[in-house]
């Protein structure tokens, strides 16, 4: 979701917001580099405005749609960055900190939070790129930021697909779930998801580079000749393998789960277990639905742009920015969903934000027990010393 996909024929103009020259079509990115891939988008402030039927209104002075869009995007990116980093790191902390949170489902949630935290950490770089109209951070960071975008997109959807299959096994095959749904297996599957995402992320990292154009620097993707073929091939492969196929698998899994939940009143023989099973299934479904809602517009937009030519208007530019920002917004929504939909997460978040005396005592006792396990010889020595002191006091005590 980087902001560098731009037409090569654009020149500089006076940017009403940054008071400096602005280079071509920098979509403030999301699908990274779907803004990179979608190189036909032009900056409404660029010289291409003369190609829009003379409608110079795309680059008016202060108060223009471009300035309003820029301010809105910067404000949204700031909120997403702060909420996303804090929320996702908090999710990872409570999963690592509390033993009761180390379930198979939460291990997958940890992976999702890690991917979201990584992508929100790139937003400051993309904001600077958008405001300055150039990429000042060098080629290495260009490669890192673009590849993180693709890694986040693919790892997130693969993890959600895994969570849906995991829920399907838990609901429809509870006996098999006992052997399969373990934290250890969940960790292995998480690693496999990152390896699978590398099929997209690593090629993108190698293709990402910086280019000098019209006095500015673009962080963009380069394709072998013929570039249009490889560019469209990447778009289509990402759309099919990192969106359509996972969404189909998720849909099938939840369709089968709904049929199972409707046909069976008692899944596990325990009302409490059934309640927890349905609650977790509902939470995963909501997280998946929100992801699809946030990411569908940008995927559809990019595919449409690959197939047909869309006239460049203010509405087209604003809608592009909106689709990109919507994809990023998903990265900060998941922690909020966990807090509202899962009692365990809600309780852990509350304990972290508002620690009570009982929680502090419990943490201290847990730490003492951990130290005792880590240093048994020291603990035994202390016990023996205390026992000897008690005996000495008993022996030296005056008789009544």
From Swiss-Prot:
The Phosphotyrosine modification is found at 168
Ranges for the region named Disordered are: 364-386
Q: Which PANTHER family match?
A: MU-TYPE OPIOID RECEPTOR, NEUROPEPTIDES RECEPTOR
Return the Pfam families for the record. Answer: 7tm_1
Task: Give the bilayer topology.
Answer: Multi-pass membrane protein
Which residues point to the Cytoplasmic side?
A: 94-106, 166-185, 256-283, 339-400
Q: Which CDD domains match?
A: 7tmA_Mu_opioid_R (cd15090)
* Protein name stated in the entry: Mu-type opioid receptor
**Sorted alphabetically, which PROSITE patterns does this protein's record hold?**
G_PROTEIN_RECEP_F1_1 (PS00237), G_PROTEIN_RECEP_F1_2 (PS50262)
The organism encoding this protein is Macaca mulatta (Rhesus macaque)
